[in-house]
Amino acid sequence: LKQRVHLIFPMLRTIPNDTHASLAHEIDFDDLIKVKINGDPVIEYPFQFEHKGLLSYRSSATDGTEIMHQLFPSKDQPVFIDRVKILNTTDKSISIDIPKIEYEYETDKKNGVLGAYKIKVTSSKKGFYQLSPNEIFEYSLIYSARLSNAIEPYISVDFEFKKREELVSKTYSDLVFESPDKILNSFFTFAKLRAVESIFKTKGGLMHAPGGGRYYAAIWANDQAEYANPFFPFLGNLEGNESAINSFRHFARFINDEYKPIPSSIIAEGIDFWNAAGDRGDMAMIAYGAGRFAMAYGDKKTAKELWPLIEWCLEFCRKKINKDGVVASDSDELEGRFPAGDANLNTSSLYYDALISASLLGDELNKDKRLLDQYKFQATAIKNAIEKYFGAEMSGYKTYQYFKENLLLRAWIATPLTVDIFDRSEGTIDALFSKELWTEDGLASQANTDQLLKSILPFVELTDLQGHDGNDLEYIINLFMHPDLKKDSYSKTNFDDSNWEKVKLPGRLEKLFEGKEPSDGIYWFRKKVNISNTDNDYELTFED
């Protein structure tokens, strides 16, 4: 067994204090002093894994013992725990040597918003123990982080374990989804837990975060306002509901008389924002999510608080209606990783649903009937415009173009179905489950993406793109799929390369461009290959 622990502490902020400024640290299990059984370092051979809110696995060891691990984070402390049980399955007494494990790493104070941080690993027990046949010995490894000058808190492993069990048990038992498909049921259960355990107590209040190793202590118009927030009232999670209300409060801070877009993301515990992708249709996302949340939450006081934000976002979208009657935007939630044109299906569909929600919510709040009638009229108009502007036959299916110039099927043709627009439901469902979009891993974002992904994966693995902001894989796919082939640099074969810089391969890409002008991380190079015998197959290989 090779074990490596990757730790992220969202509330220990690093410099620069941006979207990705959570303290992160990786510890290889081999860096820790080994436990010994009968004088020999333990080597584990895992044979069973289980994930049910805790990652559990069982291993056999070379001496015939069995070892059980339960790994879990603390519910409310910057702590991660590896709870270990050693079972003597032999017919003889064994000796266990638990060394004094005290791994410490202190960060440079210049790199921390709050100064230096200390990351530590300790063992709950140490010393020599005798274990009789069928007896169990238990100890824990405790991974923690804190301000370097802060007092190290006492951690009760049993208490942390019970808090985690309680969270998992309640979340699993609330809003149970049952279908004939057990895998789908498990997906939904994991999604519930993923939602409730990703909420952080920040200086800007409770914030639900997308996570993914990079996105914490911040909110997004899509991940929070559109996705998670409308779900929390159905689950009934107290922290989830508060984080949703808090996120809408943060977005409402940016309401303005000039109708400039609300930022896509409010980051760094609420003290900064990110809007580098322009208007992604964020106001449609916020209006959609706030309306649905308010109706599901069922509290008039909260609904009244959210109403100005909903009303402002709807007016913003109305002002973005183009000559064809659909909502224009700079991009969509994929932020240019895939093309979205000047107006996309997702944004207009969300706007339609937000208008429907607002007309219903406004009626409950006794809002001006003339305004609510306008919302109903605008909803009918945008629904008709969606059919006229986006409705199309794509790859033989009566479905939608994701944007006007779109020639490939896209997964988000499903969005109209989620907002009760069923005019093209049959063709859309057939397209979603077609060979163009459906893969063994689920829906591809765009037709044929899966095949392209496989072809460029080695390139991705050999290229260091950690500096690129966003989903690097989809970003590269987009670049590969949509070069401007009309440009001479791509289309001509008799190019003059006399002024091209020669580089020696093999070599790491970052070494090739030292001292050059900054780039977006992508460089093109060309090689002309003459093939005389076209009856044979050839393979072109770039070797490192």
Q: At which residue positions do the language-model features occur?
A:
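Active-site core of glycosidic bond-cleaving carbohydrate-active enzymes
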Residues: 220-249, 304, 308-311, 315, ...
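Short amphipathic alpha-helical coiled-coil/interface segments
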Residues: 188, 192-195, 372-390
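Short, hydrophobic/aromatic beta-strand segments
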Residues: 91-100, 351, 536-541
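An extended acidic
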Residues: 1-60, 133, 165-176, 180, ...
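Aromatic-rich carbohydrate-recognition surfaces in CAZymes
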Residues: 88, 131-137, 216-324, 344-352, ...
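Short beta-strands within extracellular/lumenal beta-sheet-rich domains
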Residues: 65-67, 517-532
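Acidic/polar, glycine-enriched structural segments that form the non-catalytic walls/loops
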Residues: 50, 62-218, 300-302, 363-364, ...
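Aromatic-lined ligand-binding clefts that engage carbohydrates, nucleic acids, or primary amines
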Residues: 500, 521, 529-544
